[in-house]
UniProtKB/Swiss-Prot annotation:
It holds the Pfam family PRTP. A zinc finger (C3H1-type) spans 205-233. It comes from Bovine herpesvirus 2 (strain BMV). GO terms for molecular function: ATP binding; zinc ion binding. The keyword Lipid metabolism does not apply. Residues 281-292 have a biased composition (Low complexity). This is Tripartite terminase subunit 1. Component of the molecular motor that translocates viral genomic DNA in empty capsid during DNA packaging. Forms a tripartite terminase complex together with TRM2 and TRM3 in the host cytoplasm. Once the complex reaches the host nucleus, it interacts with the capsid portal vertex. This portal forms a ring in which genomic DNA is translocated into the capsid. TRM1 carries an endonuclease activity that plays an important role for the cleavage of concatemeric viral DNA into unit length genomes. It is found in: Host nucleus. GO terms for biological process: viral DNA genome packaging. Associates with TRM2 and TRM3 to form the tripartite terminase complex. Interacts with portal protein. InterPro entries: UL28/UL56. Keywords: ATP-binding, Host nucleus, Late protein, Metal-binding, Nucleotide-binding, Viral genome packaging, Viral release from host cell, Zinc, Zinc-finger.
């Protein structure tokens, strides 16, 4: 028999590791349950009714888990919370609220109830936008009222609290953090897909700023570089791959279907696929001049063999033919592998929906009234931009992005000159054409077809002045044409480079907006750091208030004389210059907020680095930065000792954040 697990025989770090593993297991089960709840909220309500028994059992289990963990997490929140415990608490609250709301909607559902009313209740379509949270923060300089609507609003507010932590009471900060936590419970608590209406990737976070601080700036300021930064930390992109044969591959493994129904569903899917493929043919593209040049080059090369001497031009043609054949001609552009345009994506979505309906009718005998079908008319009435945000079942977000890029290129490359230079093998094709012309010119005798060219090249010996002027005009026209062609090529290449650079820049924004985004770890980490900082201050105040002996000598008449004596004694002694760096670091450690802790990293940085990040992330105005820099400079004489008697840290008579921060 193995010995039972005894926590007293285990080291604290091992206990912490075991606790983290258990919390991660519970969090994973919660996320699975939340995912199933989100599916039931969107599927046919008559189908979801068959799962009401399992849903009730899971809802009771969520309540039991919440009752088991909440007491310990509440006591831990007063000391130290971690992003993991915060994520578990938010997920528990979200799972309990959404699961019970779904259960209530299913209980109210009748046999002939409208799916519209069910979806309006489960998806919250009948109520207003839930992503509006009022937050009030009371500081020593006044009250601040804000509204949280986006995820970056939460991060900005927490950074502002971190900067103003010196002028914010711990009790007021705790009240504000309760409102912030309620917003996080409705958003980050799901741990699933981020709604596009609450995410704005054009607002960089503090991690984006730190990344820019360790990369080359190329002479640009941090604010200018932040203006073009696309944040991928508050929300993170997820690459979604959709397989066209996914339904055919998974049908044989569906549980609860008889063999006859499964075979009938597979046959219906096969027939539907054949019908859609028969209607998706298109005319072949006519060959261009490049194909004719390749055929001519192939004919010349095939006519040559090892027993014939190869002219110099033929070797050049062979080399260019090698480069053209070794290139990736099938993927002239990446977008050819995806849908040609948005209409093709819509056609693909229609074919997928046709196959899905055929399978449902063959397997279940009815067409499911899912959320996207019930509100299909509303989705169809959306404009192109909103339809891109909604997405589809058969087209991945990357397909939409490639279709948009292809449409952009097709629009800008409609000019013949740009279209001629758009191919990656254009230079080789032009060189092949020139080599073929030179080869033909070398093979032709001087007296045949080249008589005209030689007559133009040779100087006019016996002709009249009219012939000289005609030859001069012809040479001038040829020179103008060559210059114009070279200028057009140069301008076209520059335009193509500008177009490619613009597409690359805009592609990053398209990917962040259209790709599936999940919640990152920035918001839980920032919330935990700020909350722990104010919780430490609260514990310090409580320990001070519970001191065994409190001597209150404020009414003693000798207190003022003692104060003057101590002040005079301190002013007579100069601080040793060798102690100034340590005192400066101690000052920064006291002034810094709880969010930035670069001084505690493995590769520790000076404490003033954290103050720099704190100031820059809140967008402090330049003149306030200059005031802060002057304050940090050493003060001469006794200016540092000027303060009112027995009022070391007070803000009487001050109002406003900036004056209060200046006094602090």
């Amino acid at each position: 028999m193995a010995d039972a697990f005894d926590p007293s025989d285990t080291r604290p770090d091992e206990l912490a590791a075991v606790a983290r593993q258990k919390l991660l297991v519970v969090l994973g089960q919660l996320q699975t349950y939340i995912f199933q709840v989100e599916l039931l909220k969107r599927c046919d309500p008559q189908v979801a009714r068959h799962q009401i028994g399992k849903l009730k059992l899971n809802a009771l289990q969520v309540r039991a888990v919440s009752r088991h963990f909440m007491e310990g997490m509440s006591s831990q929140a007063a000391t130290l919370i971690t992003p993991l415990t915060l994520a578990l608490e938010l997920s528990l609250e979200y799972a309990r609220r959404e699961g019970e709301k779904l259960l209530e909607a299913l209980n109210d559902l009748g046999e002939r109830s409208s799916p519209v009313a069910y979806f309006e209740g489960t998806m919250g379509l009948a109520r207003g936008c839930p992503h509006h949270q009022a937050v009030k923060l009371a500081t020593y300089g006044g009250e601040i009222d804000k509204e949280l609507c986006f995820l970056h609003d939460v991060e900005n507010f927490l950074k502002q609290m971190n900067y103003c932590h010196l002028i914010t009471p711990a009790s007021a900060a705790a009240e504000a953090l309760v409102s912030v936590k309620a917003f996080l419970a409705r958003t980050v608590g799901s741990e699933l897909i981020v709604p596009p209406e609450i995410s704005d990737p054009s607002h960089p976070c503090h991690v984006c700023f730190e990344e820019l601080c360790v990369t080359a700036n190329q002479g640009a300021t941090a604010s200018r570089r932040l203006a073009g930064k696309i944040c991928d930390h508050v929300t993170q992109q997820a690459r979604v791959r959709l397989d066209a044969d996914e339904m055919r591959r998974n049908l044989p493994h569906v549980v609860g279907l008889s063999e006859a129904r499964r075979a009938r569903a597979l046959h219906a899917l096969e027939v539907s696929s054949k019908m859609t493929e028969a209607n998706s043919g298109g005319p072949a593209e006519a060959p261009g001049p490049a194909a004719a040049q390749e055929r001519e080059a192939s004919a010349l090369l095939d006519a040559h063999h090892v027993f014939k001497s190869a002219p110099p031009g033929l070797y050049a043609v062979s080399e260019l033919r090698f480069w053209l054949s070794s290139g990736d001609r099938t993927s002239g552009s990446t977008v050819d592998a995806f849908a040609d345009n948005l209409s093709a994506l819509a056609e693909r979505e229609r074919r997928y929906e046709t196959g899905a309906v055929a399978v449902e009718l063959a397997a279940f005998g009815r067409r499911g009234e899912h959320f996207d079908r019930t509100f299909g008319d509303r989705v169809a009435s959306l404009d192109m931009v909103d339809a891109l945000f909604v997405g589809g079942q058969s087209a991945a977000p990357d397909d939409q992005i490639e279709a948009l890029v292809r449409a952009c290129y097709n629009h800008h490359l409609s000019a013949p000159v740009l279209r001629q230079l758009a191919g990656s093998e254009h230079g080789d094709a032009e060189a092949l054409r020139s080599a073929l012309e030179g080869l033909h010119a070398a093979e032709d005798p001087p007296g045949d077809g080249n008589a005209e060219k030689e007559a133009r090249r040779a100087p006019s010996l016996g002709g009249g002045p009219e012939d000289d002027w005609a030859a001069l005009a012809a040479r001038a026209a040829a020179d103008v044409g060559a210059r114009r062609r070279l200028y057009a090529d140069r301008l076209t290449k520059r335009s193509l480079a500008s177009l490619g650079r613009c597409v690359r820049e805009q592609r990053g924004e398209l990917e962040k907006m259209l790709r599936v985004s999940t919640y990152g770890e920035v918001l839980p980490t920032v919330f935990a750091a700020v909350c722990n900082g104010f919780a430490a201050r609260t514990r310090f105040c409580e320990l001070t208030a519970r001191a065994g002996t409190v001597i209150d000598n404020r009414g003693n008449p000798d207190t003022f004389d003692t104060h003057r004596f101590m002040r005079a004694s301190l002013m007579r002694h100069r601080v040793d210059p060798a102690l100034l760096p340590g005192i400066t670091h101690q000052f920064f450690e006291l002034v810094n907020g709880p969010l930035f802790d670069h001084a505690t990293h493995g590769f520790a940085q000076p404490p003033n680095t954290a103050l720099y990040f704190s100031v820059e992330n809140v967008g402090l105005l330049p003149h306030l930065k200059e005031e802060l820099a002057r304050f940090m400079m050493g003060k001469a004489d006794s200016d540092w000792a000027i303060s009112e008697f027995q009022k070391f840290y007070h803000f009487d008579g001050t109002s406003g954040i900036t004056p209060t921060q200046r006094i602090a």
